[in-house]
Structures are given as C-alpha cells and as structure tokens.
Amino acid sequence: MSQFDHQHLSDTEEKQELKPPSMYKVIINNDDYTPMDFVIEVLMRFFKMDQERATDTMLQVHYKGKAVCGVYSAEIAETKVVQVNQYARENQHPLLCTMEQE
C-alpha cells in the first residue's frame, strides 16, 4: 500500500465517526375526558411505571397539560406513540400520545 493510499484511508476513517442516535421524548397530553385511572393504566402498561410513579406522572399531565413518559430512540418512541393512541381509541378515550426530539 502506498503512502497516499494509507493517508486517504485515515482521512476516510476520521470522517466516519459515529454519532449517537437522536433521542425522542414520548409525551402524554391532557384532555378533559380521559379518566385518570385509564392514564395510570396506560403508564403502567406501556411505560412499565409502578403505581406511585404512574400516579405522579398522571397528576403532572392533569395539572401541567402534559408529561414526558420516557425518552427513547426514534423507532421505540414511534412504536410507543402508536401503541398508546391505538389502545386509547380501542377503549374509546381521546388520550393523545406524541413524541418530540430531545
């Protein structure tokens, strides 16, 4: 391998530094119709929160209008948003779950 080839390879390797993936906040938004107990159930079921943490998060949703339920890679965040919104519709609640980049 010539010196030129080796130099070119080093430059290429430096440019290929891996960046960590973007992370996304999954957010539950307040509405005037979804029962508090249902929000707690969603938080426990989809975000693996215990009863106390789910209750605290639900109260944050209730009083502040929204709460972050977790921070995930894009694919996992999208999956959680779809799962929560689908589960809410299946149970005839308008609960809305969204995501935003951190």
From Swiss-Prot:
Region feature Disordered, mapped onto this chain: 1-21
Domain of life (superkingdom): Bacteria
SUPFAM superfamilies: ClpS-like
UniProt-listed Gene3D superfamilies: 3.30.1390.10
Database matches in InterPro entries: ClpS, ClpS_core, Ribosomal_bL12_C/ClpS-like
One Pfam family cited in the UniProt record for this chain: ClpS
GO annotation (BP), single: proteolysis
Bias (Basic and acidic residues) ranges: 1-18
Biological role stated in the UniProt entry: Involved in the modulation of the specificity of the ClpAP-mediated ATP-dependent protein degradation.
Subunit relationships: Binds to the N-terminal domain of the chaperone ClpA.
HAMAP family: ClpS
NCBIfam families hit by this protein: PRK00033.1-2, PRK00033.1-3, PRK00033.1-5
The family this protein is said to belong to: Belongs to the ClpS family.
Protein name per its UniProtKB record: ATP-dependent Clp protease adapter protein ClpS
